[in-house]
């Protein structure tokens, strides 16, 4: 029993601290660009030039994204732990889906901080390997929604939507924070799958994919803020 209580305390603390880090990284991301100006519409040559001139900024931006993703995963893990008290199997399955999303996200984000800057430098300098680097950088475009890079990102968000649908109902509780989080997660899960069906039906143009899908993900920020209050309240009650 003592071990269980101690673990609950640690996970509530993990969830709270993770939620705070998510908010901080969200603020930072507003000031650090993740791609060349123009994003989707940027020409390849302009992107190469921008990446070469802004190498440190680009890497810093994506390191911030890695921290944000891992922190949000911490919040989700704490949510999965919370629902596991009354729904153990669903909690375990939700945690597994969350872990798969981490793998889906970490691959492209590591590529952003390791591979893409090297590719841009190789192309700019024209050294051995530049012929290979050029098509690779095109494939790993961080803004075009059908590149290999962004495909992993959207896979990660889809796994988030599956997680959201799995935990939305059991998370709902008497506290206002859990009600807000539950409804927001449910809406995110439903909206993401509706958008996915619309995309498959050809109703969403390539240029609108990012704004449509990532716009829905703003609901996750609502979840994060609400759960920060919930985790803090749980921590305070444990001290009494």
Which residue stretches match the model-derived regions?
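Hydrophobic, aromatic-enriched alpha-helical segments typical of multi-pass transmembrane helices
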Residues: 2-240
């Amino acid at each position: 029993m003592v071990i269980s209580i101690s673990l609950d305390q640690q996970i509530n603390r993990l969830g709270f601290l993770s939620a705070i880090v998510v908010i901080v990284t969200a603020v930072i991301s507003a000031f650090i660009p993740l791609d060349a100006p123009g994003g989707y519409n940027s020409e390849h040559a302009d992107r190469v030039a921008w990446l070469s001139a802004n190498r440190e900024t680009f890497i810093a931006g994506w390191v911030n994204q890695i921290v944000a993703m891992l922190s949000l995963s911490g919040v989700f893990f704490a949510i999965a732990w919370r629902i596991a008290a009354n729904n153990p199997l669903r909690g375990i399955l939700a945690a597994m889906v969350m872990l798969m999303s981490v793998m889906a996200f970490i691959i492209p984000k590591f590529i952003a901080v390791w591979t893409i800057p090297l590719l841009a430098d190789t192309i700019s300098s024209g050294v051995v390997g530049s012929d290979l680097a050029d098509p690779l950088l095109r494939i790993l475009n961080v803004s075009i929604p059908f590149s290999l890079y962004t495909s992993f990102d959207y896979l990660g968000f889809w796994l988030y939507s599956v997680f959201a649908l799995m935990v939305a109902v059991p998370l709902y509780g008497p506290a206002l924070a859990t009600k807000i989080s539950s409804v927001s997660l449910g809406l995110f899960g439903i909206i993401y799958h509706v958008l996915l069906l619309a995309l498959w039906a050809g109703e969403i143009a390539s240029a609108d994919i990012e704004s449509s899908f990532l716009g829905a993900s703003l609901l996750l920020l609502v979840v994060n803020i609400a759960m920060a209050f919930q985790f803090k309240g749980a921590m305070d009650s444990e001290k009494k």
